[in-house]
């Protein structure tokens, strides 16, 4: 059992004083408060009100976690007023206290908005923020801000030097296509480096800049990545991963042995995040992909999440020696709904990330702290058989706020659906739409029905389906929203991706689903494939939701394991009377464990 350090104790005292104060961002909810809306999440990060989008500058400093985020303090819509940096602090990544905005558009170099960027801890434990400012001429420039009092655990005040911008708009880049500086890393030559997204002469590019002092920056002649096909890319994230094990690495880690790098890019024309594992040479500032056959068009790279997320951002959590990922999950109903709720946008539940043994893909898993929210448990008998058409309810949990883990055993793959045309396997989302949960298959569909009404007129299906092409099997994972709501005007697609694993060898597949009212996050195959969805069922206004396990394949499957837990409500930017969890917990949890 670890002891709380002095920094954490000091942070606890500061948070106690903070929570005793009042602010428009952190007031106690009332009957009419937007926090009481039926679709508001219970343990996902979101401000008390108004618009949020990209996660920015997550870091751990002086015993506290910090999350900044794109925030509109004026409206639940993006385009009413100019964006600021929202700022919240936590001791456990679950419970959050909202602070006043960290950066506001008050200077000529950011007069029209403080857009996305990153945080870096400089020598001397000085936190620094690099961010994109929309200047008085509405051009995108890169600015720096420093913590005014680095010893303040809450980092409540930030200084924007008058010498900003530190990187002006380049002559070969349009004024609206130069943004999102990354977390900085130190090269072995002692120079700081950052990646910045830009469109250079019509080519989507990830530029590298170098600096001795974090103020004067020089651009590398060659980009880290460039593609004529992809369109504008955003929010670049270059970070190291260990070749073996689950531990994270400091962003500046490099070396010939034991370290790979990941380049993640967010693509505007698809609103999706893509990544490639490879090697990074800091002498030339060059990235070499491990799968060059995927090409320069990052839309053919691996997907970080096959669902409704964008603008992801990771950081190295030095406290737990892990890399943690956030991503923005926007609403998918209407702007009128945003205004009526008074808020828009949530962040995904934080995920631990590490490199799979194949050296090509990342594994993602909810951080272990979620176990502290688990309350009532329910499940099924091990070995429960699900025959063709079986639908079995899991009773005993509040299924609108739950954590569900299930492992399916596939007795045989003989009835897997045959696919003769390989082109049908190129678009998994289209395949999920054609082969939804209601379409009878051979091996699958089998999985979960979540946020379901008692009559099943509304439900979200999260499931697997096995296909066979020649002598190889392909495991498809889908989240089917077509029956998620009876409302018109709600985006209800079928999301999907292939799980990169040998299902013929294992014949077992795991599924973990986090349910949080309007958010459904699913992790297939131990985190090999992830799908995030936003759902808006109508029945929640008058009745409770239900949880089912099902099989609509002609072949039976077995439930080797199924456990479901109620999850408690975290304190997320709305004060409810105490500050439990806002300091780092003394109890260390067990190491992360995953199954196939």
Curated annotation (Swiss-Prot):
Q: Has the keyword Cell membrane been applied to this entry?
A: no
Q: Which UniProt keywords apply?
A: Apoplast, Cell wall, Disulfide bond, Glycoprotein, Glycosidase, Hydrolase, Secreted, Signal
Extract one GO cellular component term from the record: apoplast
Q: Which residues are involved in binding substrate?
A: 51-54, 70, 78, 115-116, 179-180, 234
Q: Which residues form the signal peptide?
A: 1-24
Q: Extract the SUPFAM superfamilies matched here.
A: Arabinanase/levansucrase/invertase, Concanavalin A-like lectins/glucanases
Q: Which transformation does this protein catalyse, written as a reaction?
A: Hydrolysis of terminal non-reducing beta-D-fructofuranoside residues in beta-D-fructofuranosides
Disulfide bonds, which pairs?
432-478
Any single biological process term in GO:
carbohydrate metabolic process
Q: What is this protein called?
A: Beta-fructofuranosidase, insoluble isoenzyme 7
Question: Would you list which residues are glycosylated?
Answer: 82, 330, 552
The tissues where this chain's protein is expressed are given as: Expressed in roots, leaves and flowers. Weakly expressed in seeds.
Lineage top rank: taxon: Eukaryota
The entry's active site is 54
Q: InterPro entries, from UniProt?
A: ConA-like_dom_sf, Fructan_Metab_Enzymes, Glyco_hydro_32, Glyco_hydro_32_C, Glyco_hydro_32_N, Glyco_hydro_beta-prop_sf
Q: Quote the SMART domains the UniProt record gives.
A: Glyco_32
Q: Which GO terms describe its molecular function?
A: beta-fructofuranosidase activity
Q: What does this protein do?
A: May play a role in sucrose partitioning during seed development.
Recorded coiled-coil stretches:
none
- Protein family according to the UniProt entry: Belongs to the glycosyl hydrolase 32 family.
Against Pfam families, the record matches this protein to: Glyco_hydro_32C, Glyco_hydro_32N
UniProt-listed Enzyme Commission number(s): 3.2.1.26
Q: What is the lineage of its organism?
A: Eukaryota, Viridiplantae, Streptophyta, Embryophyta, Tracheophyta
* Compartments, as annotated in UniProt: Secreted, Extracellular space, Apoplast; Secreted, Cell wall
Keyword hit for Hydrolase? yes
